[in-house]
Every structure is written in C-alpha cells, then in structure tokens.
UniProtKB/Swiss-Prot annotation:
Modified residues (N6-succinyllysine): 66, 104, 122, 132, 143, 159, 166, 273, 277, 334, 410, 430, 505
Disulfide bond annotation, renumbered to this chain: 80-85
Feature: transit peptide: 1-35
Protein name: Dihydrolipoyl dehydrogenase, mitochondrial
Reported modifications of this chain: Tyrosine phosphorylated.
Family classification: Belongs to the class-I pyridine nucleotide-disulfide oxidoreductase family.
Tissue specificity: Expressed in liver (at protein level).
Subcellular location: Mitochondrion matrix; Nucleus; Cell projection, Cilium, Flagellum; Cytoplasmic vesicle, Secretory vesicle, Acrosome
Binding site for FAD: 71-80, 89, 154, 183-185, 355, 361-364
TM helices/strands, residue ranges: none
GO cellular-component term (any): pyruvate dehydrogenase complex
Gene name linked to the record: Dld
Protein's job: Lipoamide dehydrogenase is a component of the glycine cleavage system as well as an E3 component of three alpha-ketoacid dehydrogenase complexes (pyruvate-, alpha-ketoglutarate-, and branched-chain amino acid-dehydrogenase complex). The 2-oxoglutarate dehydrogenase complex is mainly active in the mitochondrion. A fraction of the 2-oxoglutarate dehydrogenase complex also localizes in the nucleus and is required for lysine succinylation of histones: associates with KAT2A on chromatin and provides succinyl-CoA to histone succinyltransferase KAT2A.
Length: 509
C-alpha cells in the first residue's frame, strides 16, 4: 500500500493542495517539508570550488545541467582566491607602492613625501576586502546561474553518488549522473620541519604575518618563493631564499630570463643561495629559528638564523579521502588522478581537472579544463594545447612566458631563431622610468612560426596573452610584426622582438 508521505508528495507535485486552498475559504496549503538527509538530484556534481571547480559548475549550469558544487571551506574560491593568487597579488601590488614611496623612486619623479609609514594592519584589511568581494562574487554567480552550493567535505560514495559531510557531522547525499573532481592542491610539507603558521609558515601564513620580520628565510626560489619573498623584502625584511636548483623562477623559465631576473632582484636587496639544500630547522628559546643548509652536492654545513621561515617547496594534489580508491580509481606515483583526453577517469562518468591531474598547477589551466570538460559532457569537442598555457611571476618586474624555452628547443633538436628587444629602448618604459628587462621571441628557423615568448619587464603578465593567442592560432613572427601596435605602449616591445626574429633587426634598437 502506498504510504501517506508518497501520496502527499504526489498530490503536492500536481498542485492539488493549491487548488483546494483556492476553492475553500480559510483552508491554506501546507508546504512540502524537505529533509537534509533527502538526496539532491543532479546532472553534474563538482567537488571543489576553486578556479577549476567554480568555473566548471557555472559553465555546466549554463549548458542546462542541474549542477551542484560542494565546497569544504566556508567561502568559495579555493586556495587561489582565499589564500593564494588573489591575496598575494594585493600584497605584491601594495608593497610595490610602499617600496616606491619609501625608497628613492618617488623622489626621482619629483614626488616628495616627508614621512612614509607602513600600516601593515590596513594593508591586510585591503587584501581581505578584495578577497571578500570576490568570494561573494562567486556566490552571486552561483545564485544567478542556479548552481546549488553544498557546504561540506565531498566524498564519492558510489559511481553516481557524492556525500558531503558538514562541520557538525551531518551529511547531504547527492545522487548525480556525472561527478567532477576539482579539489585542487595543498602545500607540500618539508620533511622534519613542522609548519605552525606563526614563525614557520607556508604560503598561507606568509600572507597574514602580524609584523614585518627582521630576517626571513625562504625555502625555495620558485614562483611562490620569489613572490612572497619580494613582498616582505619591499616592506623591510632581510630576505634570503635557499634554492636546491641553480636558478630562480622554477621549472619552465628560460635560463637567460632567469639570470637577468635574479640580477634585478638582487639589486633590489633580495638574497639567494642557489645549489643549496636545507637539512633542518630548529626553534631556539628566544623564538628565532636556526636553518641548517649545505651545498646541494654535499659539503660544509652552515646555519642561517631568522625570525620567520617560509616553506615554499611546491604543492601536491589534494586527492586523499575522496573515495577514489574504493571505486578502483588508482592514483599515479605523484598522487594525481589519471584521466584521458576528455578528463574521464577509468569510470567514464567520473571526471577530474586542475591540480589533481597532470600538467602545471595553474589557476587558468584549471579554468580552461573546467570549461572544456563540461562541454565534453554535453557532447562537445574537447581540446586544450598545454603549450599555449602561459606562466607568470608577479614580482616587479614581472616575468611571463608561454611555449618553449631556448633550452627545451635545443633538447628537442628544433632549429630556431631568436628576436630580442630591451624595455630600455621602449618609449613608454622610458617615460615610466621602468626599463628593466626585455622581450625574447623564439621562432621556427624555416617556417617563422612562433615557438615561445619570454618576457621580463613591466606588464609582462598582460603582454604574454598576446603571445598565447599567437601560439594558439599558429602565427608567425612576421604576422605579429605586421600588426599595428598603439604608440607609445609597452606592447610595442613585443612587436619589435618579433620584427627582430622575422627580419633580423628591430626598428628602434
């Protein structure tokens, strides 16, 4: 016999009670009660609301899928928006302004300020307000696009089911046709060093220090290490980065660019110990930290004492306790989820994108994957050329690149030609009194096709997108050289470098 609750639900769906209430005075309909433990029905369930997850969720909803996005944290946006890309750019920008005002830069421009003081608390407030506005923006976009947001830790509990466990222990089950894992990454711990986010910090703690440390040691001179090291160096800290490799800027950076970049940072006061490894760190009774280092190849040990130790040795995929192994989805040796070219795991309706799959751990790479992944679910084509994904270091000057480096082309045996143009010869850079760096273009020797672009200088992060567009559409160096660029602009340096690559010489150098 059909239960009363099922009869009630059936009548409610048909609007039976509404018709009764309209027909009888004094009788009103009783709204159908929903229970937290009743499953939510979805077409697509996204686990994680970082750049890959939230973009995928919105695109999914725009394509007509009933979409749920599960996020374990209180705010949307993932690491990038809350404790990564966004807050770090606020501090990089504001610390650069302080550095200009506090040093000789403003005075050289005829701007004389008697006393420049740092209000770190206010600087942190501005960072927080930017983060708050953007996280709120995602919540608004979810509402606007009808994405259902479920707060809790998402775990796959069946090939068509995800269970979100909330902070209070309660659960919400989502029955879903497709599952998309976009859980991002977490800080890679350093063996033997415990991060307390007070004096031994990860990138998260480095974004919220209560005061400027007298001496800061950074383990790692990759992208995150030089960015956060730059922030505190500009604000007055004595900063030393210890790097195992023999160059700064991390994997993928062109070596000529890296060497010039290092020289500029050193001129600003940033110190580096390259080809050096950290063997341990000890907290002393006075609160300071002794960091033990030695040559990467082995040798005499040395101790560097600091007030704050920043650990920046990379990130690892956040793939534990997601229920993958229980379904037979095994991780690769680096903890990543194996997927095919449509981002499907070995279970076709379970997908993965972003930092949990192979490729660079970049927010914009995750965004692209999120969009094309759900387009693929809808039957569309799935294509991404990872050679066209740009990388940026947001120091001052900025560093940006896309495509192959000179070292990679040599290793692959590809014949190439080089075009360079210094910002010192660019009129806009001259008027801005900001002339460090250059643009370096790598073109195919016989076809002239652009193979790589490497930029060190002001606005490099914006300029590199022109290069990414050129690579995506297979442009030649001459194609770019023949595009009229507005004058005076920094982007003219990009055109001039392509002129040099295509014709052997630029115009203005």
């Amino acid at each position: 016999m059909q239960s009363w609750s099922r009869v009630y639900r059936s009548l409610a769906k048909k609007g039976h009670f509404n018709r009764i209430s309209h027909g009888l005075q004094g009788v009103s309909s009783v709204p159908l009660r929903t229970y937290a433990d009743q499953p939510i029905e979805a077409d697509v369930t996204v686990i994680g609301s970082g750049p890959g997850g939230y973009v995928a969720a919105i695109k999914s909803a725009q394509l007509g899928f009933k979409t749920v996005c599960i996020e374990k944290n209180e705010t949307l946006g993932g690491t990038c928006l809350n404790v990564g890309c966004i807050p770090s750019k606020a501090l990089l920008n504001n610390s650069h302004y302080y550095h200009m005002a506090h040093g000789k830069d403003f005075a050289s421009r005829g701007i004389e300020i008697p006393e420049v003081r740092l209000n770190l608390e206010k600087m942190m407030e501005q960072k927080h307000s930017a983060v708050k506005a953007l996280t709120g923006g995602i919540a608004h976009l979810f509402k606007q696009n009808k994405v259902v947001h479920v707060n809790g830790f998402g775990k796959i509990t069946g090939k068509n089911q995800v269970t979100a466990t909330k902070a209070d222990g309660s659960t919400q089950v989502i029955d879903t046709k497709n599952i998309l894992v976009a859980t991002g990454s977490e800080v890679t711990p350093f063996p033997g060093i415990t991060i307390d986010e007070d004096t031994i910090v990860s990138s998260t703690g480095a974004l919220s220090l209560k005061k400027v440390p007298e001496k800061l040691v950074v383990i790692g001179a990759g992208v995150i290490g030089v960015e956060l090291g730059s922030v505190w160096q500009r604000l007055g800290a004595d900063v030393t980065a210890v790097e195992f490799l023999g160059h700064v800027g991390g994997i993928g950076i062109d070596m000529e660019i890296s060497k010039n970049f290092q020289r500029i940072l050193q001129r600003q006061g940033f110190k580096f110990k390259l080809n050096t490894k950290v063997t341990g760190a000890t907290k002393k009774s006075d609160g300071k930290i002794d960091v033990s280092v030695e040559a990467a190849s082995g040798g005499k040990a040395e101790v560097i004492t600091c007030d704050v130790l920043l650990v920046c040795i990379g990130r690892r995929p956040f793939t534990q306790n997601l229920g993958l192994e229980e379904l037979g989805i095994e991780l690769d040796p680096k903890g990543r989820i194996p997927v095919n070219n449509r981002f499907q795991t070995k279970i076709p309706n379970i997908y993965a994108i972003g930092d949990v799959v192979a490729g660079p751990m970049l927010a914009h790479k995750a965004e692209d994957e999120g969009i094309i992944c759900v387009e693929g679910m809808a039957g569309g084509a799935v294509h991404i050329d990872y050679n066209c994904v740009p990388s940026v270091i947001y120091t001052h000057p900025e560093v940006a690149w896309v495509g192959k480096s000179e070292e990679q082309l040599k290793e692959e045996g590809i014949e190439f030609k080089i075009g360079k143009f210094p910002f010192a010869a660019n009129s806009r850079a001259k008027t801005n009194a900001d002339t460090d760096g250059m643009v370096k273009i790598l073109g195919h020797k016989s076809t002239d096709r652009v193979l790589g672009a490497h930029i060190l200088g002001p606005g490099a992060g914006e300029m590199v997108n022109e290069a990414a567009l050129a690579l995506e559409y297979g442009a030649s160096c001459e194609d770019i050289a023949r595009v009229c660029h507005a004058h005076p602009t920094l982007s003219e340096a990009f055109r001039e470098a392509n002129l040099a690559a295509a014709f052997g010489k630029p115009i203005n150098f």
